[in-house]
Swiss-Prot record:
It catalyses: (6R)-5,10-methylene-5,6,7,8-tetrahydrofolate + glycine + H2O = (6S)-5,6,7,8-tetrahydrofolate + L-serine. This is Serine hydroxymethyltransferase 1. The keyword Iron does not apply. It comes from Dictyostelium discoideum. The modification N6-(pyridoxal phosphate)lysine is found at residue 240. Its cofactor is pyridoxal 5'-phosphate. It comes from the Eukaryota.
Length: 457
């Protein structure tokens, strides 16, 4: 009998990749992950991702595939759809769901492909106001996202108070007449007024979409207002607050469409358009191993344990925000309703990218972010901080207050270095890599972080 290939462990087949995996695991274990779009998924999800489902090609949808041997993946995908609807308490006679998008950006573009024609008009939150690239981002000189290249985009913005200016949104919508209005953001710490946005969309005859990628886990836990009460389409990633694998999902209305007075006016025709946009218009075969991971994550999200986790996410975000404000720092909107805070460093005359690089030396991972009034996208004045990942490791409010102390020390060290070498980033980077204070802080951070379990190990 001949030997069967493919059963040799990774360490023997490719030690180079094996070592990189171990280094990354060590980095995650010893460091403090504060990037708001990241999380730690469970071992169960990882097992599904690494399963034999990765071997199966399955173009099409359950019951209508272009390949044979799909009876098991049909069951898998149908189960994932049912779990998605259940996790968000949706009636399948009124909502459907597509679980095939490879990630959040493809999910959003599939919605645009389904509901719009080239050069139709869209309105999403401006990127410097906390929106996402895929919501129509463009600069004065260049169309950046495909959503602004293939469609005409007019963003809405936040006001000086950091809150969405719904009045101006309505005024501009009445003039611009968009076919699609997009709610949801990647760096907005407050609740959304979906009812107000529904009224605006109805006034101009637009679809209302929500991209809840960042906070879908909090919606599932009923800790934020639900976009499903007012939106026609809802998209999400599955790896942020939902704590699943890296994937995308699209929910869409079914049944009768109603006006603002609750009167049925027409039948929704969204489902077939979105399914056709995902496949065959934009994608080929779905990644069934990822869909398996999504299904596991959705089951986990539909549990009391997850609801307790999501509540702790909110508590921890509030705790670190309050701790920073108590130290005299400024937060956009003076706090948060969700999993993230926006920290304005401009009063300290320190840029977000300098702080990010200094924090990296101390093994604390954050990301620079624009805040209202920023004019330089390359060197924004803010930092975005999220609580989801470290909450998955078991950290509580007191732990996040300790992290605020670490962050405060990084500011002090950074300002001292900037005072010596000047404001050029290149000189600052050279100096922080020689900073004994940052290296000493790194040791404290790693000792602190190593006390907490890393999911999936």
């Amino acid at each position: 009998m001949g030997s069967v290939s493919g059963n040799t462990p990774l360490k023997e087949v490719d030690n180079e990749i094996f070592e990189l995996m171990n280094r990354e695991k060590d980095r995650q274990f010893k460091g403090l992950e504060l990037i708001a779009s990241e999380n730690f998924t469970s071992r169960a999800v990882m097992e599904a991702l690494g399963s034999h489902f990765t071997n199966k090609y399955a173009e099409g949808y359950p019951g209508s595939r272009y390949y044979g041997g799909t009876e098991v993946v049909d069951e898998l995908e149908t189960l994932c759809q049912k779990r998605a609807l259940k996790a968000f308490r949706l009636d399948e006679s009124k909502w459907g769901v597509n679980v095939q998008p490879y990630s959040g950006s493809p999910a959003n573009f599939a919605v645009y492909t389904a509901l719009l024609r080239p050069h139709d008009r869209i309105m999403g939150l401006d990127l410097p106001s906390g929106g996402h690239l895929t919501h129509g981002y463009q600069t004065d000189k260049k169309k950046i996202s495909a959503s602004s290249i293939f469609f005409e985009s007019m963003p809405y913005q936040i006001g000086a108070d950091g809150l969405i200016d719904y009045q101006r949104l309505e005024e501009n919508a009445l003039l611009f007449k968009p076919k699609l209005i997009i709610s949801g953001a990647s760096a907005y710490p407050r609740e959304w007024d979906y009812k107000r946005m529904r009224a605006i969309a109805d006034k101009v005859g637009a679809y209302l979409m929500c991209d809840m990628a960042h906070y879908s886990g909090l919606v599932a836990a009923q800790l934020l207002d639900s976009p499903f009460d007012y939106c026609d389409v809802v998209t999400s990633t599955t790896h942020k607050t939902l704590r699943g694998p890296r994937s995308g999902i699209i929910f869409f209305r079914r049944g009768k469409r109603v006006d603002g007075n609750g009167k049925e006016i027409e039948e929704y025709d969204i489902e077939s358009k979105i399914n056709f946009a995902v496949f065959p218009s934009l994608q080929g075969g779905p990644h069934e191993n990822v869909i398996a991971g999504v299904a596991v994550a959705l089951k986990e999200a539909d549990s009391q344990e997850f609801k307790e986790y999501a509540l702790q996410v909110k508590k921890n975000a509030a705790a670190i925000g309050n701790a920073l404000m108590n130290k005299g720092y400024k937060l956009v909107t003076n706090g948060t309703d969700n999993h993230l805070i926006l920290w304005d460093l401009r009063p300290k005359e320190l840029t977000g990218n300098k702080f990010e690089k200094a924090a990296d030396i101390a093994n604390i991972t954050v990301n620079k972010n624009a805040v209202h009034g920023d004019t330089n996208a390359i060197s924004p004045g803010g930092i975005r901080i999220g609580s989801s990942a470290l909450t998955s490791r078991g950290l509580k409010e007191a732990d996040f207050e300790k992290i605020a102390d670490f962050l405060d020390r990084i500011v002090s060290i950074s300002l001292e270095i900037q005072g010596r070498v000047g404001k050029k980033l290149v000189d600052f980077v050279v100096e922080i890599n020689k900073s004994k204070e940052l290296l000493d802080l790194r040791k404290e951070v790693e000792e602190f972080s190593s006390k907490f379990t890393l999911p999936g190990i």
